[in-house]
Amino acid sequence: MKILANAIREGNILEYQNNLWIVSKKPDHTKPGKGGAYIQLEMKNLKTGTKIYERFSSSDYLEKATLEQRNYQYLYQENNHLVLMDLESFEQILVQKSIIASNKLPFLLENTVITVETYKDEPIRLVLPHTVVVEILETSPNIKGATVTASYKPAILSNGAKIMVPPYLSAGEKIVVKLEDISFVERAK
């Protein structure tokens, strides 16, 4: 599907130079005093991980990759693969572990429903839920009289991840974590 360079957003996947590229940063729109406006894109190759910077005229058209989305349930890890089950056909598939960012892998909990985006039947990207509920395994003791302030303390979660939490939380409590930037949201209800 052709898309105008002006309409490209961060996270879009493009077909460019016979490869798939993800736009890894917000496009930089520039209109110099002399000459036409252009768009500067930082793109990352989905296969090799190499980054390139390309400049396109704002009137250029690029090929946006058409991705298919299906819901799967995460079952378990096996060596360098994740085992997922299709929620409609109950077929199991293996997906490379490298398809997901290493800092988000600990938050992929068993039986979590995720979306797998495929291009020509090849998995390209996993879309995790926006938030997950995890338990605080270890943190410094509760501070009496602590209220919601700007000061945070480190905590180790049940999945092994480290995160900063407010001082009024203690070990054993469940919290909601936003996966976009791996940050504390609130106590789990």
From Swiss-Prot:
Protein family according to the UniProt entry: Belongs to the elongation factor P family.
GO terms of biological process kind: peptide biosynthetic process
Cellular component, GO annotation: cytoplasm
Pathway(s) where this gene product acts: Protein biosynthesis; polypeptide chain elongation
Protein name in UniProt: Elongation factor P
Pfam families assigned: EFP, EFP_N, Elong-fact-P_C
Record function comment: Involved in peptide bond synthesis. Stimulates efficient translation and peptide-bond synthesis on native or reconstituted 70S ribosomes in vitro. Probably functions indirectly by altering the affinity of the ribosome for aminoacyl-tRNA, thus increasing their reactivity as acceptors for peptidyl transferase.
Localization terms from the record: Cytoplasm
Gene name of the encoded protein: efp
SMART domains, per database record: EFP, Elong-fact-P_C
Single Gene Ontology MF annotation: translation elongation factor activity
UniProt KW keywords: Cytoplasm, Elongation factor, Protein biosynthesis
InterPro entries named in the record: Elong-fact-P_C, NA-bd_OB-fold, Rib_uL2_dom2, Transl_elong_fac_P/YeiP, Transl_elong_KOW-like, Transl_elong_P/YeiP_cen, Transl_elong_P/YeiP_CS, Transl_elongation_fac_P
Key word Protein biosynthesis present: yes
Disulfide cysteine pairs (residue numbers): none
Species, as recorded: Orientia tsutsugamushi (strain Ikeda)
